Swiss-Prot record:
The gene is CYP7A1. It catalyses: cholesterol + reduced [NADPH--hemoprotein reductase] + O2 = 7alpha-hydroxycholesterol + oxidized [NADPH--hemoprotein reductase] + H2O + H(+); 4beta-hydroxycholesterol + reduced [NADPH--hemoprotein reductase] + O2 = 4beta,7alpha-dihydroxycholesterol + oxidized [NADPH--hemoprotein reductase] + H2O + H(+); lathosterol + reduced [NADPH--hemoprotein reductase] + O2 = 7alpha,8alpha-epoxy-5alpha-cholestan-3beta-ol + oxidized [NADPH--hemoprotein reductase] + H2O + H(+); lathosterol + reduced [NADPH--hemoprotein reductase] + O2 = 5alpha-cholestan-7-oxo-3beta-ol + oxidized [NADPH--hemoprotein reductase] + H2O + H(+). Detected in liver. Its EC number is 1.14.14.26, 1.14.14.23. The keyword Zinc-finger does not apply. Its cofactor is heme. Keywords: Cholesterol metabolism, Endoplasmic reticulum, Heme, Iron, Lipid metabolism, Membrane, Metal-binding, Microsome, Monooxygenase, Oxidoreductase, Steroid metabolism, Sterol metabolism, Transmembrane, Transmembrane helix. The lineage of its organism: Eukaryota, Metazoa, Chordata, Craniata, Vertebrata. GO terms for cellular component: endoplasmic reticulum membrane; intracellular membrane-bounded organelle. This is Cytochrome P450 7A1.
Length: 501
């Protein structure tokens, strides 16, 4: 018996050795330098996950602007020269940008693939987004968000001039989640108290689910996180079509998705709901921390606060809008919102400092990638990745890059600045918190408008102060690097009280 175990042990050891010898990838002629790491399958994943920016900078110094890293069994080619970003996008015919995103969505939210090539639906989700997040549809969505933000902030509760102290991130989370949920998925006009309780419960479920999202993207099954799994199922239950049909003022995006799910897909009721949950997550997970950073940096800079207040007051005066809790809600149209370069610059600068997105494309076939730094052979199923935080924090492009400068995106005429340089050359891509090319976030225009609306209302309705007048900027939560806007590692206490009572 012992002999048999020895034989099986030797066979297993030989198989492992053969796998290590034959399965290890070797760099071929014309390919980028290869950093495989020392842990089978994981490769460099632990080092990358601990601090992506430091990891990529170290490899950039070691290998140059283009190098390959093994991450979770995948070979990822990082392009770190911002002057080459537009060259990468010119190779679009060789990329499958949908594969990674559709696979990740199905894995994280628990529905079958929404890629039409997999046969579960014939809906082109990108066309759906383009129809409902631009043009007239964007106008109605933005108007609804302004109304719902004020519904949330101007809640008909006893008001006083007393200061209210709260964590700023918690405040932004609560307000933006509630207003955003109502904007996308509608309201129950006859059950306000029940709706409020439902939203608050959904908020807690969303936090539990979102907490494990980086692990789900990394490939871990949600069933090992029972609390998060239960939270996901409860969120999806509230987004079933039977429940949505009882609500009024559902956004055009969700109405169209409901129709297409019902007519073009083979999804069951729960799977349809989970495709809506994916939209809920996409609309909140980055917007909430982006809102926090915009409010935090605006308040922390006296110059930014003064310039923003003057711009908001002028916009309201020009639009003949009165600030009054008992009067009509504030309304600014799309043109008026777009003509606020100071707020635009504050938001852009806040996102520049907090964005850590990973722009990913999968190679459909073997091809040669031609860049400013040379040409490189890429294998089928390899991943091309851009990490714009390298560019956003490059001192040559953005002098003193770790300092918030509210007017960084304003030119000498106080209009939006669009000209930035690297190595004396004008950059085509200099600001990329929303991705790029075919993978650019379809909801980016709405996201900017809702953050801007939030700032307008906070400046209009409230007096704002930090509890600690010498508050320091909280560190970024690196556990979410690669997913978009990084939240603060700790909350910051602030206080607010109503004006004009």
């Amino acid at each position: 018996m012992i002999t048999i175990f020895w034989i099986w042990g030797i066979c297993l050891s030989v198989c492992c050795c053969l796998w290590l010898i034959l399965g290890l990838r070797r760099r071929r002629m014309g390919e980028p330098p290869l950093e495989k790491g020392w842990i089978p399958y994981l490769g460099c994943a632990l080092q990358f996950g601990a601090n992506p920016l430091d990891f990529l900078r170290a490899n950039q110094r070691k290998y140059g602007h283009v190098f390959t890293c093994k991450l979770m069994g995948k070979y990822v080619h990082f392009i770190t020269n911002s002057l080459s970003y537009h060259k990468v996008l010119c190779h679009g015919k060789y990329f499958d940008w949908k594969k990674f995103h559709f696979t990740t969505s199905a894995k994280a939210f628990g529905h079958r693939s929404i890629d039409p090539r997999d046969g579960n639906t014939t809906e082109n989700i990108n066309n759906t987004f383009n129809k409902t997040l631009q043009g007239d549809a964007l106008i109605s969505l933005t108007d609804a968000m302004m109304e719902n933000l004020q519904l949330t902030l101007r809640r008909p509760e006893p008001k006083s001039r007393a200061w209210v102290t709260e964590g700023m991130y918690s405040f932004c989370y609560r307000v933006m989640f509630e207003a955003g949920y109502l904007t996308l998925f509608g309201r129950e006009l006859t059950r306000q108290d029940a709706q409020r309780a439902f939203i608050l419960n959904s908020l807690e479920d969303f936090k539990q689910f979102d907490k494990v999202f980086p692990a789900l993207v990394a490939g871990l099954p949600i069933h090992i996180f029972m609390t998060a799994h239960n939270a996901r199922e409860k969120l999806a239950e509230g987004l079933k079509h039977d429940n949505l049909r009882t609500r009024d003022h559902i956004s055009e995006l969700i109405r169209l998705r409901m129709f297409l799910n019902d007519t073009l897909s083979t999804f069951d009721a729960m799977e349809k709901a989970k495709t809506h949950l994916a939209i809920l997550w996409a609309s909140q997970a980055n917007t909430i921390p982006a809102t926090f950073w915009s409010l935090f940096h605006m308040m922390r800079s006296s110059e930014a606060l003064k310039a923003a207040t003057e711009e908001v007051n002028k916009a309201l005066e020009d639009a003949d809008q009165q600030i009054n809790f008992e009067g009509k809600p504030i309304h600014l149209n799309q043109t008026q919102l777009n003509d606020m370069p100071v707020l635009d610059s504050i938001i852009k600068e806040s996102l520049r400092l907090s964005s850590a997105s990973l722009n990913i494309r999968t190679a459909k076939e073997d091809f040669t990638l031609h860049l400013e730094d040379g040409s490189y052979n890429i294998r089928k199923d390899d991943i091309i990745a851009l990490y714009p935080q390298l560019m956003h924090l490059d001192p040559e492009i953005y002098p003193d890059p770790m300092t918030f400068k509210y007017d960084r995106y304003l030119d000498e005429n106080r209009k939006t600045k669009t000209t930035f340089y690297s190595k004396g050359l004008k950059l085509k891509y200099y600001y990329m918190p929303f991705g790029s090319g075919a993978t650019i976030c379809p909801g980016r225009l709405f996201a900017i408008q809702e953050i801007k609306q939030f700032l307008i209302l906070m400046l209009s309705y409230f007096e704002l102060e930090f509890v600690d007048s010498h508050v320091k900027c909280p560190p970024l939560d690196q556990s979410r690097a690669g997913l978009g806007i990084l939240p603060p590692l700790n909350d910051i206490e602030f206080k607010y009280k109503f004006k004009h009572l």
